[in-house]
From Swiss-Prot, chain A:
GO cellular component: cytoplasm; nucleus; proteasome core complex, alpha-subunit complex
Record CDD domains: proteasome_alpha_type_1
Keywords, in A-Z order: Cytoplasm, Nucleus, Proteasome
Main subcellular location: cytoplasm
Subcellular location: Cytoplasm; Nucleus
Keyword Kinase applies: no
Name used for this protein in its record: Proteasome subunit alpha type-1
SUPFAM superfamilies recorded: N-terminal nucleophile aminohydrolases (Ntn hydrolases)
Amino acid sequence: MFRNQYDGDVTVWSPQGRLHQVEYAVEAMKQGSATVGIKSETHAVIVALKRAQNDLSSHQKKVYEIDTHAGVSIAGLLSDGRILARYLQTECSSWRWDYKQAVPIKKLAESMQLKLQANTQYYGRRPFGVGILIAGYDKDGAHIIQTDPSAEVVSMHGTSIGARSQSARTYLERNVDNFEKSTPEQLIVHALLALRDTLPAEENLNAQNTSIGIVGKDSPFSLLEDAQVAVHLNQVSTHPRTTGGAAAAAAPGGAEPMQM
Amino acid sequence: SSIGTGYDLAASTFSPDGRIFQVEYAQKAVDNAGTMIAIRGKNGVVVVADKLISSKLYTDNANPRMFNVNDNVGVAVAGNYPDGFALKNYAYGEAMKWLKDYREPMPIQNIANSVAEYIHIHTLGISRPFGAGAFFMSWNKQTGGRLFLVEPSGLNYEYKAWAVGKHRQAAKAEIEKLKIEELDVNQLVKEAARIIMVVRDENKDKNVQIEMGWVGEQTNGKYEEVPSEVVTAAEEWAIAKLDEDDMDD
């Protein structure tokens, strides 16, 4: 039933020095709908694509505020992601209690990395099947932090994780030089254009399936309302769609019930 | 070989010929990672790592491999990055505890020993061994430069110079050609950059970046990241030197 002898448990090294269970957890993250994060000098933006189980159900929440200066978005097993979001909320508030100030994003990223790493080493646990993007603003400026189940935690100018996220990363790599000086509005447009590239041609972004979170200098983290999301989507709709990119990297399977 | 016979699935299992395969496999994670070299010279220690930068979306100095354990001791982790980060965190915590208890900085030998013990516990079979190793380095007037390497097996040796990772054999051969005891830290930085570049596989090692750390007389015994302009200068020197050598051939 196993693909090889060395993939039954996280606590087993393969002869090549790889951890198969951890690599499989990364695959779980890749099945979740995509999320994109980018930053300028002054702001960090996260946008996410939400899935609904069916026409009658609501869309699953993917973006959480974790403190006034930071928020996260999730791709992968959303229930795992919620646990991590809650963990980060607790980290933020306990830092505030200890130091009477907001936690630096770097410290948040470090504690996140240690928590994720423990789940790749100790028996009886599994890695989190989820990747998250942390958007934050602190005295060092704006930050986008990317995490994945293998506990790779890295600071980025912009990035995307989740299904067909390669298409979004291609967009970001082409435009990364423009982000630094972008206004918050331009940043949101870039993020939405990148996110739209992860969609198959017959689907499109709308106010219901799109989440936008933004944080920056003198502006606390805010998760935009549907009406505000629609305004930003209007700006995006005038840009022609780049076709082909999304289809090339089509993810396997449809919408799994757990992974959204 | 005994691979696949079932004796290699847990660190708690010896193979019939007395080997612990899980520990050997964990070592592979270090062997397959980017090359890292550490050299002790006349008046300090230099460490250099070759890092893969897989995308231009990474910020500058994302995922540093070198850290301070305390003001005087540096650590450089090689292998699986998250495992290395956890080791660095443990070392930092131990140094902090020592400082609280004894009101003086934890000596490098004690740091290396305590991390080695921690790594060793993970080779007994309750959890998987660490897929990372760590260099520790320091310098002061009394002891001069000191350099330790702790491996995934929990072994802890002091070195004059050593290399781990993908191109360690070639790197060690290059180090042996130098009279490292006679080189000061500024020369070491250049030679270390040259060695990292010369052992690279031109076809495979693309999008790589050099990261360096040093401790010595000129840093007043403090471990520090090597400033980026010094790294750049060392790389330029190395490229010129390599071109020169090519001309001679």
